[in-house]
Design a protein with these regions (language model features):
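Metal-dependent nuclease catalytic core centered on acidic motifs
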Residues: 1-29, 58-123
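A short acidic/basic microdomain associated with nuclease active sites
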Residues: 26-39, 44-45
């Protein structure tokens, strides 16, 4: 297994594991945050280089879906990681919607987007 990836014995969904391994291969240190046992309490997904990040892996290329990713992530972390590799037809328009939403967000301070196996970072 990759030395940059610590799973803490947490069973990840395939998309989550794929994202973690992708980032680890890019040199990021990824640690899975152990989920809370408290009902209705959501934890962020990862520590990435020591910072808390929430991962969203949308599967639909719709503005509403992308908006929901921001709203849900903001409740868990100020850092959002969006992996678009599972969206069929993700294109420049998809990225434009995401970047525009990020620019107007008061709660999300950092954004990383994985699209076409490229990592894009915004602050």
């Amino acid at each position: 297994m990759n030395n940059n990836f610590i799973d803490n014995n947490v069973k990840l969904k395939p998309a989550e594991k794929s994202t973690a391994l992708f980032l680890a291969s890019k040199g990021f240190r990824i640690e899975v945050i152990i989920p809370s046992n408290t009902p209705h309490n959501k934890n962020p997904d990862f520590l990435i280089n020591g910072k808390i990040w929430e991962l969203k892996c949308p599967t639909k290329n719709r503005r509403e879906t992308l908006e929901r990713c921001f709203k849900k992530a903001a409740k868990q972390s100020e850092n959002l990681l969006l992996d678009l590799r599972n969206i069929k037809g993700a294109n420049k328009n998809t990225l434009d919607i995401i970047v525009s939403r990020f620019r107007y967000s008061k709660s999300i301070k950092q954004l990383m987007v994985i699209q076409n196996n490229k990592l894009l970072r915004y602050k």
